[in-house]
Curated annotation (Swiss-Prot):
<protein>
    <recommendedName>
        <fullName>Nucleoid-associated protein HCH_02614</fullName>
    </recommendedName>
</protein>
<comment type="similarity">
    <text>Belongs to the YbaB/EbfC family.</text>
</comment>
<comment type="subunit">
    <text>Homodimer.</text>
</comment>
<dbReference type="Pfam" id="PF02575">
    <property type="entry name" value="YbaB_DNA_bd"/>
</dbReference>
<dbReference type="GO" id="GO:0003677">
    <property type="term" value="F:DNA binding"/>
</dbReference>
<keyword id="KW-0963">Cytoplasm</keyword>
<dbReference type="InterPro" id="IPR004401">
    <property type="entry name" value="YbaB/EbfC"/>
</dbReference>
<dbReference type="GO" id="GO:0005829">
    <property type="term" value="C:cytosol"/>
</dbReference>
<comment type="function">
    <text>Binds to DNA and alters its conformation. May be involved in regulation of gene expression, nucleoid organization and DNA protection.</text>
</comment>
<keyword id="KW-0238">DNA-binding</keyword>
<dbReference type="GO" id="GO:0043590">
    <property type="term" value="C:bacterial nucleoid"/>
</dbReference>
<dbReference type="InterPro" id="IPR036894">
    <property type="entry name" value="YbaB-like_sf"/>
</dbReference>
């Protein structure tokens, strides 16, 4: 009887691990957009934090270099926060009911 329960437990653990790996792949490929300056600068970033695209409104090309740099940094930071929130939300949904703390880093 115990062997059967252990086998079921192992199957369940393997299934959870497969689901987590799939979720991590989906998160890595998910893209978010961060912006600053009311949309004058937009950054597209994937779940690996790779910046895929930077859009700068032409009106900013007339501004001082420091303003442009500040807006770029703000847009990147906005995108990073959105990636992290997306990752946290997805993992919270995956681990709901398992008794795993929401910020627990999985080893796989």
């Amino acid at each position: 009887m115990i062997k059967g329960n252990m086998g079921d437990l192992m199957k369940q653990a393997q299934k959870i691990q497969e689901q987590m790996q799939k979720a991590q792949e989906e998160l890595a490929n998910a893209e978010v957009s961060g912006e600053s300056g009311g949309g004058l600068i937009k950054i597209v970033m994937n779940g690996r934090h790779d910046v895929k695209k930077v859009e700068i409104d032409a009106s900013l090309m007339q501004e001082e270099k420091e303003i442009l740099e500040d807006l770029l940094a703000a847009a990147v930071n906005d995108a990073v926060r959105k990636v992290e929130k997306n990752n946290q939300d997805k993992m919270s949904n995956m681990t709901a009911g398992l008794g795993i703390p929401p910020n627990f880093k999985m080893p796989f």
